[in-house]
Amino acid sequence: MKPICKFLLAPALFCLGGVAPIFAQMSPLLPSEKAPLSDRYVAYQIEAKYDAKNHSLDAAETLTWTNYTGQPQDHLPFHLYLNAFQPKSTFTREGYIGGNRDVKIGAKWEDRKFGEDVIKSFEVVGMGDLTGNLRFIHPDDDNAEDKTVLEVQLPRPVAPNEKITFKILFHDQFPEVVARSGYKRDFLLAGQWFPKIGVWWKNAWNCHQYHATTEFFADFGTFDVKVTVPSHYNVGATGVQVAENTNADGTKTVEYKAEDVHDFAWTTDPSTKIVEDTVTISSGTVKIRLIMQPGHMASAPRYMDALKGTMKKFDEWIGPYPYSQITVVDPPHGGGPAGGMEYPTFITADTTWWMWDGLKVPEVVVEHEFGHQYWYGMVATNEFEEAWLDEGINQYTECKIMDALYGRDVDFLNTRVATAGERGVDHAVYLGLADLDPITRYGWKFIDSNSYSGITYSKTALMLLTLEHIIGEQKVREAQHVYFERYRFKHPTGDDFMNTVNEVAGQNLDWYWNQAVRGTQILDYRILSASSDRADWADKNAPKREKKGETEYISSVVVHRKGDFIMPVTLEAKFDDGETVRDSWDGVDRWHRYTWQKKAKLVSAEIDPDHAIWLDHDVFNNSWLHDGDGHATGKIAGYWMVATQWFAQFLSWLA
C-alpha cells in the first residue's frame, strides 16, 4: 500500500452530527480584569475532542477577526501547519535536501503515521458556507503538493475595522512526534494544530508555508480552548486552567484561557506527574507548573531552580513577565523532537534519566525556552523572515544568564575531566561553518539546516558578544531593555532592533551591522610574522653591547587582516623584562607592522588579548610565542586546530 493510501485510511472522523452542536455550546470570553497589552485582532474559541487511541481530534473553531489592514479584504490566508508532515510537502522536501534530522531519523515515511489538518466545513457568519471557496496556495515555491497555506475567497470585501466571525470544523491527525508536534506512545504535544489566520504585515499578507527550518508568526489575541481527553489523562496548555468537568463517557473536558498571546499549544499524557511552585518577580507572583515524566523526576528540582533564576534575571535585565503562569513540559523517552520548544506561557524541556549534574542540559534548555517568552512571545518578530531576532538574541541572552547563574566557562559542562561555557560552544559551532549566508536571510533560503542554525543562533550570539567589545556590556543590555519595552506586542523588524542599539549607543553602528548582520564577511586577523633581533645585527654601525641589559633589540610584529571583515583590533606584546605594551589598529589596511627598539626581547604577541572579539573565525592564528625556532608552538597549535575543527563540526551537526 502506498503511503498516501495508508494515510487516507486513517481512523474515521466523528460524525458531523456529534460535532456541529459544539458551536451552540460555546460561551463568550469572560471580560478581562486587566487592560489589554496587545491589539487583540483575533479571538479564538476552540472545542476539541481527542481520540487517544488514534492520536487524532475533531474540533470546532470560532474565530473573530478584526480587519486592521486599513483596506478592504476579500481573500484571507490561513496556516494549516500539520499538513507539513506529509511525503510531498515543502517541509519534507526541504528536510531531505537540507538535512533536517527530525524528518530523516527513525521510521521511514512509508512506515509513519502522517500529520494532517482537514477542513470539514468553513463558514463566515453572514456570508454562509464558504467551504467551496477554499484553495491551497504556495506563496514561497511552486510545490502544488504543499497544503500548509489555505486561502478563502469571500463573497464580499471586509471593510476596514469591520469584525467577521469564522466557524470552522476540522479534523487533526497527529504524526509520530516530529518537529515540535505529535505523539509518542500515550504522550501528545499539540502544537500548530488549528487553522490560524495570517498576518497583515508591511502592507501585504504574510502567511508563509511551513518550511523545514522555519518557525511561526501570528497576531496577538485571546484564546478560550476546551479539550476533551480520557479522564485519567493530565493536561497542560498555554494560559491558565479555568474549568474541568467530568463527562459520563469516561472523558473529561478541561478549559484554558489566555490573553495577549499569538498561539496556543497543549499536551496530554496519562503517566505524568505534576510539580508546582511559585516565583515572585516585579509583576507579581507567577505559578510554575512542571509536567514531568515519572522517570525524570530527579530533574524536576533542576528545572525549577533554573527557571526561577532565569525569570528573575529577565525581570531584572529585560522587563517584566506579565502572565500569571508558565508551564514546562518534560517529554518522554523517544519524544526528543517535542523537546526544546516554546509556545506562549508554555515550553518543552529536555532531560534523561541519567543526566548528571555536571552537564547543564536541563538548565540550558529551560533557560533558552523561557527566554523565547520575551523575543518570540512578547516582541513577536517574524520568524520566517528574521529568525535571528528571536533565536539569536535569545541565544545571546542565554549566554549572559547562564554565566550569571552558573559561572562563565562552566555553564554548559562542569566536570573534573572537562569544562565548557555557553559562548565557547557557540564559537565552536561557528568555527564549523563556511559563513555562506547572512544573518538576515529568510529561514528557508539558507544553504542547509546547519547553516541556518549556526548562523541564526550561534553567529548572532557571537555578534552581540562582540558588540559588547565595541559599545560595552551595559549598553548592549540597556539596548535590549529599551527594545523590549518599546516593541513588545508590536512585531518589530531587524532595522528596529539595530536602530535602537544605535540610539542607545549614541553612535552609528551601520559599519558593524553591514558586515556582521547583513553581510557574510569573515572576521579573521592573524599574526603574519614576528621577530626580535639584536639591533647591532640590523645596523652594522650600531655600537656593540655585550653586558646584560645593554643589548638593544628591534622587535617587529606584522598583523594581517586575512578576512574581509574590518574591525579595530588590539595587539598585546610582552617583553622579557616584564613589560607589556598594548597598541590599537583600525584594521582597515590588509596589514600593519608594529616595531619597537628597546633593551628587552619580545617573548610573545597576541591579537585581542581580552578575547572579546567572538566573531573571530580563527583564534589559533592570534598569538605568537618565542620558543627558539617556533616549531613546537606550531605543532601544538596544529593539534589543537584539528581537534577543535572536529569538535566544531560535531556541534554544528547537533545544532
Regions from the language model: what does each represent?
Residues 23-58, 184, 510-511, 515:
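N-terminal, polar/Ser/Thr-rich
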Residues 165-168, 601-616:
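Short, aromatic- and glycine-rich surface loops/edge beta-strands on solvent-exposed regions
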Residues 41, 80, 256, 289-557, ...:
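Hydrophobic alpha-helical and helix-loop surface patches within well-folded domains
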Residues 99-127, 142-148, 153, 165-272, ...:
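Extended, low-hydrophobicity, Ser/Thr/Pro/Gly-biased non-transmembrane segments
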Residues 56-84, 88-89, 99-102:
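Ligand-binding face of N-terminal immunoglobulin V-set domains in extracellular IgSF glycoproteins
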Residues 236-237, 509-510, 523-609:
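Beta-strand-rich binding/interaction modules
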Residues 8-21:
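Bacterial N-terminal signal peptides
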